Amino acid sequence: MIRILTDSASDILPAEAEQLGVTVIPLNVTLQDGTVLRDGIDKTPSEYYALLKECHKLPTTSQPSPELFERFYQDAAAAGDEVLGIFLSHELSGTWQCARLAADLVNVDNVLFVDSANVCLGEGLLVRLAVQLRAAGRTLVQIATDLEHAKEHLHLVAAIDDLKYLRKGGRLPAAVAVAGGMLGIKPLITIKEGKVAMAGKARGLPGAYVALFKKVEELGGISAAVPALAGYTLSAREVQPIQTYLQDNLQCAEPLVRQIGCVIGTHAGPGAFGLAFFDQGLEL
């Protein structure tokens, strides 16, 4: 059996993880009073965002404990199972390295790793593709190879409402900071080569949706092979225009909609929304 392992930056919550047949290792969020929350476990995203609004000091995020990975690998080895690990970009977190180091420490075989070179909705979409390929009977090596190809066609585009969270978290490129500092301007960000990058800018919320839709088309449209994944931090209403656009203008299947979790939401902040998708160049 192939076990699929990922981290909570994929924003796959426990109930969905069980449904998909994947294991999610939680990252941590430390509040200003020292309380440590396990991402996706100890607080719902909505509960966390209520806390975040009241925080004078931005919570910090950290990678999982290596022991969590070690126990997973040992259990898989004891059962004779193979493991495919899919993690957020190594450019944004040490989680990828932590997972690999833990595998070396317990000296397990039949473990392959894929750096998603993405995060959040993008990472989660790659995990869902892995589940789809596993169900189709692909081998461990075949799935890993397919994912390495697929991630070249994976895109995440998001609109940020308040840049103070990215700025305080130290994950704000200079170009985004300049754009976001202009009155009424909402920057669009993406993930390029595993890092946060500027994708465009727009004036006001309506302009942000138009800019996002334009970017989707510029990036090659949306593949019908894997449903797109829309996400929001605060309100599901934020992605309703995205759903309508995809169905009415691109004739896409209705995208999956998920709330963005605590770790990514710490840096994106309340009011962010986005879309992850594979472009039409994807071949499976």
Model-derived regions: residue spans:
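Class I S-adenosyl-L-methionine
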Residues: 35-85, 89-108
